[in-house]
């Protein structure tokens, strides 16, 4: 990396989050987007400005990630595509073989160990064999329900229990993300798709629980996640679709972590396009129980899309200089936005 030169970045994924990354990165003199990779081969060669009018100029979309990495030689690859390890593993392989630092938003990457399965073992192997950092970045997991409680724990005397909650408005997301979060189903379809795994609600609860447990010296040996639907009371126009009364408007979820038979971690998520109908305001809240109880609140809550985008772009300089290996979001340290002059 040339000292003083912008960090060269290739982005995989130009959805809602990826588009936001492109827009914000354009305002950062220390970051230069040199490539944008999409899955849809029909978009090959199209000017990026046609998809993201207020993003970087002079770039064309490509569905050939290997070629883009070879030609553009980025210092950082940002992967903002899918949620699970099997889904992002092919892109992680490409980026690691290109020997570039990697920032990835996949929720299942937020906290992994080599023994967590074949995909996790391969990811650790990629980082070691190619001597690159693979860094988990994101808002949740990655900040609200894990890193933020740990920051608060920095001023605690001890921690006997943690209770964190998040209420988030989903109306800023497109139809694919909404569907995975449980929006737009009948009651019967919701139950079926939840059982099949198509509806995940919030992914990353288990990763956040394990991350917190390891960080405070009380490893979690049992996790549990319960999910229930929220139903719409009236029709709503949404991005790329509409919602009818009686369809699901989102989910309520409770995740718990237990250590040696003691449940001491509770993470709660209310995610809906109709928070107003259930009398809930967007909010992030964490309460630490201990010798000196602590409570912190972000109100009206960190908005999902812009806050995730900020978390990613602000992390790029740290990712570029990270040591080789697999890093959780807690390993990043502070990544504040730059002051406006």
State where each predicted segment sits:
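N-terminal Rossmann-like dinucleotide-binding module
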Residues: 1-52
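Short, ordered loop/turn segments at secondary-structure junctions
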Residues: 39-41, 82, 106-110, 139-140, ...
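Active-site-lining helix/loop region of Rossmann-like oxidoreductase modules
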Residues: 12, 153-284, 302, 314
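Rossmann-fold NAD(P) dinucleotide-binding segment
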Residues: 67-76, 85-107
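Alpha-helical support elements that line or immediately flank enzyme active sites
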Residues: 143-155
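C-terminal helical cap and adjacent loop that interface with cofactors, partners, or active-site loops
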Residues: 274-341
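Conserved N-terminal Rossmann-fold NAD(P) cofactor-binding segment
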Residues: 40-72
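Rossmann-fold NAD(P)-binding glycine/threonine-rich loop
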Residues: 106-132
